[in-house]
Structures are given as structure tokens and as C-alpha cells.
């Protein structure tokens, strides 16, 4: 419902947005795999500090003391995509909080849970307490790509990532931007980096030449001024009274 009012006793129809739910579930399941991958790469000190999932993207905040390296990010991506390719079954079950802890299920730090909780198990890879929507198999996530990693607070990092259709749209946009940049640089996408490096060299050479010309022009200007000063001083010298009297002597 986007506008209007509901009154008591009115009949309504509820309908799930299947496409939205499907894409959201892919991103949600990806956060579970991501958290386990982060703990494997960075250490067991990593804990979830917040998250956001939508049909377009996912965001995962976690505890860590420094920025991740390119190698660490690449390793995390590799692990997540390996688990997607492994087509792990995703199973949910309700159990007691004590039983879930015995199973080794990860819980959100500071979260209060009731006596009955929902456990989401992804093969032998991930086991977490969660009440959200998920895929039935990790293969449904399709693919995973980290697009940014940044710090948001002391000891808290943030990863933003894409999966499935969101990642496809991202690469389509990159491809279009690359084609446009290549056209401006008068080259092809596969040679754009080489072309940019060549242009940077040309710009550097032009800047150096421009600096030389500016210095030469400054020297020439100073030389011209000095010539004019000498000429003026000569005129002043000749036109002085003593010089005129000397010039009339036999």
C-alpha cells in the first residue's frame, strides 16, 4: 500500500514480491558465507557489528583493527565464491538457544534471544542464528564481488558487495564506462591502460617544455628590461650638465 487509509474490518490481500525476496535472500545468504570467510582469513576476533541487505546489494560491518590488504580481500572473495560453486544445501531448523550453542552456532554479539531460536546451516561451512530469508542452496547466490572495504569507526570495518543480478548490472555499467573512456582516448578497451600511460608521458613532457619556455621568457623579459635600463642610464649620463659642458670643450 503506497497511499490511502485502512479501516477496521476491511479486507486486504497480501502478496510477496517474489523477485525482490529472491534477490534479497541471495544477498542475505552471502553475508553468512562472508562472515565465515572473514574469520578464516582475518581471525576469530571478527564479529558482526551490523549488516544491511536489499535486492541490489549487501553491506557487512565487522570488528577488525586495520584495513584489509588486497591479498586478504582477494582470498575472502575466493572462499565465498568457492562455497557458492560447491552448491551447499541451506537448511533451517528451530531449536533451543542452549542446543544451538552446543551446535556451535554463531550468534550476534549483544543480541537477546528467546528460548527458541532459528538456526541456518550452510553445509558444513556456516552455522548461525538467524530469522531472515535465505536461498535453499548456495549455488543460487550465483557470484560474489567485494566493491569496497572501509573503516566506519574505531575497530570497525565495512564491506560492500554485490551478488547475482546486482553484480551483472555493475559489470554492465563498468563495461559501458570503459567503452566511453576508450572512445574519448581514441583507443580500444583492451589498450586503454597503455593509451593512458602514453598520454600521461606526453602530458609530462609538455609540462616540462612549458616550464622551460616560461623560464626562457622570464630570462628574455629580464634581459629586455636591463637593456632598456642601460639605454636610459646612458641618456641620463649624456644629458647631465657636466657632460654637456664637457662636450663643448675644444
Show the residue positions of the predicted features.
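Histidine-centered catalytic micro-motifs
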Residues: 26-39, 129-137
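Short, hydrophobic beta-strand segments
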Residues: 14-20, 57-66, 161, 233-235, ...
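Active-site palm subdomain of RNA-directed nucleic acid polymerases
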Residues: 37-50
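Non-catalytic interaction/regulatory segments
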Residues: 45, 55, 62-152
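Terminal appendage regions of diverse proteins
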Residues: 45, 55, 138-239
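Conserved nucleotide-binding/hydrolysis modules and their immediate coupling elements
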Residues: 1-14
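Single conserved hydrophobic/aromatic residue that forms the stacking wall/gate
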Residues: 236-237, 241-250
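Short pre-active-site segment immediately N-terminal to the catalytic Zn-binding motif
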Residues: 20-26
